[in-house]
């Protein structure tokens, strides 16, 4: 889609890490916002640059990949009414609210953007399936945004809230968004077996109108 015609832009968030084929150079970019343009740490400076660049747009979508077979979902790091509305308009059925008070100091780029912002998380990364899902979702969103429409209506949308994590050895039997039970507790797994020492993040299904901050 021509950038000028559709009024959007795309950029690589962590350019140095991308060039080196690694997640980060000094620290996780998505744990570095709002950043500091005078920092000696590359990702902290880059976070500040990206936050400033975000002022040029009406909304920001931050694209991420995961090893898990989660399909494509939205993540809302900062669940304001505007960001929830943006997620509901994006055309994806599954939406994950993942907010932390600690992230006010240093956290996700989308949480600190000066305009409505969410993440698209898609997996398994580096697969044709993930590429096709991401491409289709982004294209639909850009086309709908240009015409002032929403991609889908509210009745097709599910919301989940991340409330904790399960530590331990990886469990291949767990599937994201498939109800599981551990120690008498029922929860929906997310990013199962993604990180060392963490089995998964735990979610509850919720109503989106109960989540505004």
Cite the ranges covered by each PLM segment:
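Structured catalytic-domain cores with a bias toward divalent-metal coordination
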Residues: 1-213
């Amino acid at each position: 889609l021509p950038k000028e015609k559709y009024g959007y832009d795309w950029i690589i968030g962590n350019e140095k890490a991308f060039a080196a084929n690694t997640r980060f150079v000094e620290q996780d970019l998505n744990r570095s916002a709002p950043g500091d343009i005078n920092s000696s740490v590359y990702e902290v400076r880059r976070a500040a640059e990206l936050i400033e660049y975000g002022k040029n747009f009406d909304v920001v979508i931050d694209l991420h990949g995961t090893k898990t077979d989660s399909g494509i979902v939205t993540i809302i790091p900062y669940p304001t009414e505007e960001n929830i509305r943006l997620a509901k308009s994006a055309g994806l059925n599954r939406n994950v609210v993942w907010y932390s008070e600690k992230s006010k100091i240093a956290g996700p780029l989308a949480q600190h953007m000066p305009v409505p912002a969410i993440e698209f998380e898609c997996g398994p990364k580096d697969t044709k399936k993930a590429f096709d899902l991401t491409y289709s979702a982004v294209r639909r969103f850009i086309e709908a945004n240009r015409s002032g429409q929403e991609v889908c209506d509210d009745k097709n949308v599910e919301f989940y809230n991340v409330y904790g994590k399960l530590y331990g050895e990886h469990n291949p039997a767990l599937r994201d968004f498939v109800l599981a039970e551990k120690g008498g507790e029922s929860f929906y797994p997310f990013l199962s077996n993604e990180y060392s020492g963490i089995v998964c993040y735990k979610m509850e299904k919720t109503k989106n109108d109960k989540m505004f901050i």
